Amino acid sequence: MPDRLFLFAGYDQDCIIDDAVIYYVKTLSKYGDVILCMDCNCPKKEIDKIKKYTIHTIASRHGEYDFGSYKRCFQYATNKNILKNYDYMYLVNDSVFGPTINIRQTLKNIEKTSTDAASMIVSKHKTHTFMESWFIRLNKKVFLSDWFSNFINSVEKEENKFDITIKY
């Protein structure tokens, strides 16, 4: 089985880690390591509900949306010098409920593509095509590159969600 690292971004306005997030993270943890970053100040009792399924959990309001959470997860993995241990890194968030199907086959399918990056869904806009950021697979060539490190570490708080969508 390939070694996978899932960077999981979550948010809850009430600072709870709900059953849907626990289920999603628990399922992913069967197929790789999970680092979770919640963009809210979850109390310890909430973190305790999920920490057995993660290698690290961060729960702190940063206001940078999902990419800010991905940034913090990536920084943790970089600081712990563990990125080199993985074949694939996934950017996953709680925007969707799931998985509702066996995720193992989905992972196998997305990993057999010959591209450096792939996603579960590719959408077409009027002017461009883009990968939906709620489930993106990156290969080692990408996530160990200076380009990706510079990109993800440049994420900052934006004025509104539209700016985030366009920029990231």
Placement of each model-derived feature along the sequence:
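Conserved donor-nucleotide/metal-binding helix-loop-beta segment in metal-dependent transferases, i.e.
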Residues: 98-128
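Acidic metal-phosphate-binding loop of nucleotide-sugar-dependent transferases
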Residues: 63, 96-97
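Conserved donor sugar-nucleotide recognition element shared by glycan-biosynthetic enzymes
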Residues: 66-70
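Catalytic core and acceptor-binding pocket of nucleotide-sugar-dependent glycosyltransferases
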Residues: 121-168
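N-terminal anchoring/stem segment of glycosyltransferases
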Residues: 1-65, 75-84, 88
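Alpha-helical elements of Rossmann-like donor-binding domains used by nucleotide-donor carbohydrate transfer enzymes
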Residues: 23, 72, 105-109
